[in-house]
Every structure is written in structure tokens, then in C-alpha cells.
């Protein structure tokens, strides 16, 4: 009975390897696995091992979407460099679905049922990805990024527009401000652009000063903590001696 050796030099029976493969699939599926001289590719092609379960959730094709799957594949084979517009593809599927006869529809409905059954089988081994992006820590005391010239213009004229048109939605207010900004003369825009440039320079200086201060590293913190605990222990011992 042949055993399978993984890249980390562990040996498994075929069944154990199948279970272990399912467990590792979502993290890292190694291709350099040996089984009595056979490559993993050979084992997969001959269906001696199951393919690792997908970590990405798949969708089921609806019946009418199957109507153009084969023609689309043929077109792709003949024109490998040509791109397929997804929205146009789906429109054609829907149009063809309305025009074909009931007997022909049955063929595609069967394809959809088979696809659904395949989807349900795959979902039994589906392992969702556990990779979560850690949120970057934002220092609340860090210098705030300065606004652009347009936003300085908006902050000045927004209250005026809201006063004149109290029923306007936020989107409409923004559109009106954008129109006003576009119609403003270049000479008048310079006032806000110069103000924005000054704020940007101040921001750069504040950032440089903030970085120059630096933060005490963790090693230094540990040393200080150790010294404090040592001092506290010595004080307690002195109290006991007294």
C-alpha cells in the first residue's frame, strides 16, 4: 500500500492525505508532493486524488445563461485575443432564451440542474478564506491632511447655497458647488489655491516634526518595566526585613 509524502516530509495514507489536503487547501496547496515516484499532476489527471477545495465561493449558472456558453467558448477559441463584453453577452442570452422552443429549453434546464448539483457538492468542501486585513492604526493626534482649493471654496459657499435652497439634497448641493467652481474665473480661484498651498506646506512641516519626535520602541519599554518591577520587589524585601 503506497503512502504519500508531503513537502514537509510527513507521510500519509491516500485517505489521510485527502483529509490533510482539504485542511491545508485554503492556506497553501503545495505542488511538489511525491507518491512512489508519481507527480501530483499525474495523480490529479488520473483522479487518484481529489482536487483541493476552492477557497472562493462559486455561483450557479442560470438556465438562460447556458444558451450561449458553447458558442461563446467556440468564439473564444477562434479569436483568443478578442474580448467578450459581459453585459452584451447576458443580453444575447436573455434574447435567445425568449425565442427558443420549449423542447430546446429543457436541454438548458437540465444543464442548470447539473450545474446546481455540482455547485452543492463543491460547497460541502468549500473553505472560506480567513484572511482579514488588519486596520491600520490612526493616531488621533497626528496632523490632519489639508483640504484642496475646491473644498475650501465649498466650505465657504455651502452655507449660502443651503440657505437659498433648503430643500436641496447633498448630491444636488455638490453639483451646484461644482458648477460654481467651474464658472469661477482663474484669478478668483488663485485665492483658494494659494490658501491650499500654504496649508499643505504647514502640513508637511507638522508631519516632519511629528516623525522627528518618534515613539519609544517596545524593547525600551520592556527595560523600563523590568527596572520598575525589580525596584518594587527590592522595596517589598526591605519592608519584610524591617
UniProtKB/Swiss-Prot annotation:
Residues 218-231 have a biased composition (Basic residues). A motif (Nuclear localization signal) lies at residues 91-108. SMART domains: HMG, SAND. It comes from the Eukaryota. Residues 205-242 are annotated as: Disordered. It is found in: Nucleus; Nucleus, PML body; Nucleus, Nuclear body; Cytoplasm. Sumoylated. Sumoylated with SUMO1. Sumoylation depends on a functional nuclear localization signal but is not necessary for nuclear import or nuclear body targeting. Sumoylation may stabilize the interaction with CBX5. Phosphorylated. InterPro entries: HMG_box_dom, HMG_box_dom_sf, HMGB, SAND-like_dom_sf, SAND_dom. GO terms for biological process: negative regulation of endothelial cell migration; negative regulation of protein export from nucleus; regulation of angiogenesis; regulation of extrinsic apoptotic signaling pathway via death domain receptors; regulation of Fas signaling pathway; regulation of transcription by RNA polymerase II; telomere maintenance. Its main location: nucleus. The keyword Chaperone does not apply. The keyword Ubl conjugation applies. Keywords: Coiled coil, Cytoplasm, DNA-binding, Nucleus, Phosphoprotein, Repeat, Transcription, Transcription regulation, Ubl conjugation. It holds the Pfam family HMG_box. One of its GO terms (molecular function) is DNA binding. Residues 1-50 form the SAND domain. GO terms for cellular component: cytoplasm; PML body. Residues 51-127, 143-211 bind DNA. CDD domains: HMG-box_HMGB_rpt1 (cd21978), HMG-box_HMGB_rpt2 (cd21979). Homodimer. Interacts with members of the HP1 family of nonhistone chromosomal protein, such as CBX5 and CBX3 via the PxVxL motif. Interacts with ETS1; the interaction is direct and modulates ETS1 transcriptional activity. Interacts with the MRN complex which is composed of two heterodimers RAD50/MRE11 associated with a single NBN; recruits the complex to PML-related bodies. Interacts with HIPK2; positively regulates TP53-dependent transcription. Interacts with CASP8AP2; may negatively regulate CASP8AP2 export from the nucleus to the cytoplasm. Together with PML, this tumor suppressor is a major constituent of the PML bodies, a subnuclear organelle involved in a large number of physiological processes including cell growth, differentiation and apoptosis. Functions as a transcriptional coactivator of ETS1 and ETS2. Under certain conditions, it may also act as a corepressor of ETS1 preventing its binding to DNA. Through the regulation of ETS1 it may play a role in angiogenesis, controlling endothelial cell motility and invasion. Through interaction with the MRN complex it may be involved in the regulation of telomeres lengthening. PANTHER family: HIGH MOBILITY GROUP PROTEIN DSP1, PTHR48112:SF18. This is Nuclear autoantigen Sp-100. It comes from Hylobates lar. The gene is SP100.
Amino acid at each position: 500500500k503506497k503512502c504519500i509524502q508531503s513537502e514537509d516530509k510527513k507521510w500519509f495514507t491516500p485517505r489521510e492525505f485527502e483529509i490533510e489536503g482539504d485542511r491545508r487547501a485554503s492556506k497553501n496547496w503545495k505542488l511538489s508532493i511525491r507518491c512512489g515516484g508519481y507527480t501530483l499532476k499525474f495523480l490529479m489527471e488520473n483522479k487518484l486524488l481529489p482536487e483541493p477545495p476552492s477557497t472562493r465561493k462559486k455561483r450557479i449558472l442560470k438556465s438562460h445563461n447556458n444558451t450561449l456558453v458553447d458558442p461563446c467558448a467556440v468564439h473564444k477559441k477562434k479569436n483568443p485575443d478578442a474580448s467578450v463584453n459581459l453585459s452584451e453577452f447576458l443580453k444575447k442570452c436573455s434574447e435567445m432564451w425568449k425565442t427558443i422552443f420549449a423542447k430546446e429549453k429543457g436541454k438548458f434546464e437540465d444543464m442548470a440542474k447539473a450545474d446546481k448539483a455540482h455547485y452543492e457538492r463543491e460547497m460541502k468542501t468549500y473553505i472560506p478564506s480567513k484572511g482579514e486585513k488588519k486596520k491600520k492604526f490612526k493616531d488621533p493626534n497626528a496632523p490632519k491632511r489639508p483640504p484642496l482649493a475646491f473644498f475650501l471654496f465649498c466650505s465657504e459657499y455651502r452655507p449660502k447655497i443651503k440657505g437659498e435652497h433648503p430643500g436641496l439634497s447633498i448630491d444636488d448641493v455638490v453639483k451646484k458647488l461644482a458648477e460654481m467652481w467651474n464658472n469661477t474665473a482663474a484669478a478668483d480661484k488663485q485665492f483658494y489655491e494659494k490658501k491650499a498651498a500654504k496649508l499643505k506646506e504647514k502640513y508637511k512641516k507638522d508631519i516632519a516634526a511629528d516623525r522627528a519626535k518618534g515613539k519609544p520602541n517596545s524593547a525600551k519599554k520592556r527595560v523600563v518595566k523590568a527596572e520598575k518591577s525589580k525596584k518594587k520587589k527590592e522595596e517589598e524585601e526591605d519592608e519584610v526585613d524591617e
